[in-house]
Amino acid sequence: MKEAGRFAKVSVRLYLNDGYSAPEMPEENDIDFGSAEYRRMLEASLVNLGDTKRLEKALCKARAGQDVTIAFIGGSITQGAGAIPINTECYAYKTYKAFCGMFGDGDNIHYIKAGVGGTPSELGMIRYERDVLRNFTVQPDIVVVEFAVNDAGDETNGVCYESLVRKILMSENEPAVVLLFSVFSDDYNLEERLRPVGFNYKLPMVSVKECVVPQFYDAARRIITKNQYFYDCFHPTNAGHKVMADCLGTLFEKVDIKAQKALETAGGDLKEALKAIGDTAFDNESAAPHYGNSFEKVELFDRQNLPTMDIVWNFDMGGFNRIDDELQCVEMDMDIETTPEFPYNWKHDRSGR
């Protein structure tokens, strides 16, 4: 009987036909995650600290024992592709667990993972309310946005990505936004397009590319090889997911120094510490977009939420009177079981009825 989460190991032996040869695979050293050189790699990932006030407030709340929710939205890497098992070895879960470890037993820290393989920020900005906010029942304190390798087909050239970022920044509870730039095995990502968005809003930015790619080509300083980092040409191995989590952890460590100082100066009074950190409101009117903000107020309408909206709808669905149940499914949060995407849809009835 098949059981979710159970894995087996197999040995695969490849043979070459006569007359063919293959280069000998060099022996790889164990990854020294505790070395000073590894620490320098992680430091290189912090391409911009920006204005960390929102993040400081979230860390202060966590240190004070208040409930704090950390959310992740992105593509297949955020979903956990390459990680085995996908729900507990992915970078998002590893980051969450490290975050819990920074703040006592972590019972006050909550986790949302909303990665969908093969999807860009064009879809991310539409599903944010459902997959991250859970139809406005959740207010995350920190949102990590990871679309640096998914947006190549974005016809708006950054407008969708920036619209998603602005949508999060405009949230009433003022969550911290962290931009995370993952990388493919050919060293490709779109961070040169996306960095200006982060600089425009003074956001913390973490580049996995800056962390791992330079050392791939420096034999004297190499800590992890491409073969060790990548599961395939797109996704990280368990070790690669750990590197990504450690990059984010390095950011949190640096900002936590400020958070601890704010709490100490306030004598442990959380309210006073938050007040001292300063205003973090997002002024939508004065914050000019870098690429554009055409979609910052876009909303998802489907069979579930359409009837609840304070709008009078009068239209004929025509042939779209069925529901499609053959949907892409993903592992949300800590689940090993999958959840269908966009289940409350309209499907065309080809019979014409």
Language model regions located:
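N-terminal secretory targeting modules
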Residues: M1-I73, T78-I86, G104-N108, V138, ...
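Alpha-helical cap/lid subdomain in secreted, periplasmic
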Residues: G5, Y15-G19, R63-Q66, C90-H110, ...
